[in-house]
Amino acid sequence: MKIKAALIAVSAAALLAACSQPADTAGAPTTDAASTAPVALKATSGVYVMDPTHASLQWSLPHNSISNYTARFNKFDAKITLDTANLANSMVEATIDPASVDANYQGDYVGTHAATGFKSWSEDIAKNKVFLNATAFPQITFKSTKVELTGTRTAKVTGDLTFLGVTKPVTLDATFNGDLEKHPFVPAPAIGFSAEGKFKRTDFGMALGPVGDEVTIRFDAEFIKEVAPAAPAAPAA
């Protein structure tokens, strides 16, 4: 479930890669260069912050070997420092509030799980020590370490995911969905992407339990460039 965090951060990194300006490929094989050169961007270098009203972070894992159980996080944030001239200098950071997990449980949880002491399945997942243990570990974080272009709109993003006090590298596949020179409601450039990835819960110290070990995460978001506030007007003479 924590994998969400990784996904959210990594996804951001992937976006950077997918939408950064093409680098000088002189001397490189023509076919390979053409197949991975990123599309031209309208967005410019700078810091891009996630638009929380246009973002989602979901995770799923095998359940009873017959289906995939899916839930989401409602509170998370991400920031991309985009350098279109040098992709290696671009950075992505993300944080997730594990207490915001939303299982959308439709049954009578209290009536069927009275012994747990939790008021809902979402609270159980968030606070139970065998799951997200949000009281002891109130944040899941991700910081990118590498972005590798794989196509004109795709990239692999690797970063450090810290979950349950354990930090491990996670790699995600990201897709650049498009960008705007000027957002229709905000006077600034905007960019969007999707990302997916997988990791094992046991790698972060979570017991296997009755559900699957491998977690799949899916992240979709729009990012808007930070604009410096206008300088105050000079006082009248």
Regions picked out by a protein language model, each given a short descriptive name:
Residues M1-A23:
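Gram-negative bacterial Sec-dependent N-terminal signal peptides
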Residues C19-A237:
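Low-complexity, acidic/polar, glycine-enriched regions of mature
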